[in-house]
Amino acid sequence: MFCELMLCKLVLIKKNIGKDFKKDFKKDEIMFSKSTIAIGRFAPTPSGRMHIGNMVAMLAAWLSAKSQGGHMLLRLEDLDIARMPKDASARVIDDLKWAGLDWVGEPTYQHERTEIYQEALESLESLQDDDGNSLIYPCFCSRSDIRAIAAPQEGDGFIRYPGTCRNLRKTSEGLAQIEMRLQNNQQHSLRLAVPSADSPQANVSFIDAIFGAQSFNINRDLGDMVIRRADGVFSYQLAVVVDDVLSGVNDIVRGRDLLRSAALQIWIGELLEKSGFFAAHGVHYVRPQFAHLPLIDNAQGDRLAKSKHSLDVGALREAGWSAERMIGYCMYLLGYKKHGQNQPVDMSAADALALFESFDTPWGSVRANLADKSVPFLD
């Protein structure tokens, strides 16, 4: 009885807070059938002016959808709107228009969609793990707490949450501690409990159109992920799945740093399908086609960052770069070289699409060199 009362109280408190591959790629293996409309998306985070790496990803996404007779949507991933620079979204939109990368419909803004994310969260709360607990639980750990007890994986800086607060639910003492902290209004995030490492549900596999067969154990490789931050901001991992499925996106092109996230997002999509969330909105979850790109680094081999104004598109435009020069350079970084030339060639977005479509195997030039690319003569 104690546990039942505590669980009910925990759910009510959370709801109230929320209110406020194969080596041989064939064309038909990685492209949609003619009866399926490819819908891609530009999904930039307007945390600053886009850099050239962002433009490479935007162009690649546009090429993928357009080459399949589809179209693009534009979604501004501004969940943490308080930290977004003023006019950053407008500048992103202007840069895309300037480059000739078009989309259909009006842009959508994630900060305006918190109600639908809350609904998705509540759907996940209704699901239980193997121990009969809700898949959503409160986490009182700070980032420094987690860094102190967990090591980054694979040298990419990713830190797997060790499950400290999840383990509190395993004992009566831990449950009492959770209840006390909630009663004291202790700040906490909400996490999504992944299956145990030895559970078949923890293994997620998919074919990436560029990097090939991928397989992740979402327990060992990712761990329990934050679904809503302590300040009430919903996580990227939840919002992106909700928005992609509800808007019909089925063609996702982005950087390889999100390969790991693809597995988690597939699992979240399947959970929301199981919960009935998507059916309630007249859609069903279907796995999208993924293509993850090598990253773009600067001359020192460091990843480009908006915060460092790395190869800022605005600065390049002010320096006299034309849209054709930008598109040509992005195609060069993707490995698509016009007429065998080994230097970037200016071209329009339409020219880039024709060049992309001239290759027999989609993404063949990208797969020929999966190493991250550097742009030394632009730094």
What is the predicted function of each stretch?
Residues 2, 7-47, 72, 177-183, ...:
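Non-catalytic terminal extensions that flank enzyme cores
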Residues 3, 139-141, 165:
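Disulfide-bonded cysteines in secreted/extracellular proteins and peptides
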Residues 30-156, 257, 261-285, 340-347:
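N-terminal Rossmann-like or analogous alpha/beta NTP/dinucleotide-binding catalytic cores
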Residues 51, 85, 142, 169-174, ...:
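Helix N-cap and loop-to-helix transition residues
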Residues 80-90, 298-300, 354-364:
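Short, mixed-charge aromatic SLiMs
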Residues 88, 117, 245, 261-264, ...:
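Alpha-helical structural motif
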Residues 95, 120, 149, 164, ...:
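Residues that form generic nucleotide/phosphate-binding pockets
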Residues 133, 144-305, 312-317, 376-379:
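Active-site cores that bind ATP or allylic diphosphates and position pyrophosphate for catalysis
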